[in-house]
């Protein structure tokens, strides 16, 4: 299992696991013993084995399902970077194993497709019978896209990278064939039949700003951004014209900005661990400073969560006390849902985020396709859908070429050492 699977099981981040198991700093090893706090294990055991699965992949999104007909779905294709085209016939098993171990993209492709296979099997049980083509994107892209299977497909999923995907999108010009970018969300060429299924950073920022405006417009907004995020700071100042901008990173700087009669929403924008760590520590200390028998209420938020918040230098307890709130393209599931149970039974491990992405994207694309047989004409009838860890809400972007961008973003918040969806 990877760190992601362990986090879904036990609610412990990679940095938490490394703190408990210093030998894991260079990665997880096969057959290694891992120490997990009893409280976290007991919570997983009780959830995984005694609770009712909280996700039914055969009965989700009833509105979409009721509008979707199996008769409208005929053929789809996957173009994924398996990178196996150059593997010869000699000692094939060893070569494939080495490719999965030594190459970074091949495991992602196989994980994604393993989740898609569960979705395809589920759809078949729901009465959907259609042709599925699978191609290795490391082959001749022009030859692949000219294949009759691709030309006849109503939906093409992949490739992963922006460069390869844009090449495919430029070669498939038939508006009856929707081309879906499964993982890339930067510099996608949005032709009229192209779908950027992963929300962009700008979309995530906009969704978070809208959430804050809707829920905290009357509260005390505080902006804290380092010198490398001045553009984002200016954007936040325009969005929240009454916000206070803290320039002095100190206890006094925060004390002067905090309001003890309102909730304080501190927008922290930085990718520097020293800056973020100091800000979190000072804000957490401020929670204990009483004025007129009142303690301040502080919510730490960011409109763009970088990897810096995964650092072992940050305390999850402090982030939880500050109700850390941020946008994300995928929420965490706890591994007790019926898809994860079925995946583990099939493959022997819990699904990682790529397997879940493959499942969610396949389910959504096929069910949407079933509404009319053409993805483009479905978007006016079907709004936002939500599956295990991913949302889909497509909006046509006429300014970028007429393609579609996914607006489906989760807003989540740390609460009592759990990450909960608030929007």
Q: Language-model segments: what does each one mean?
A:
Residues 1-11, 15, 19-423:
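Extracytosolic ligand-binding ectodomains
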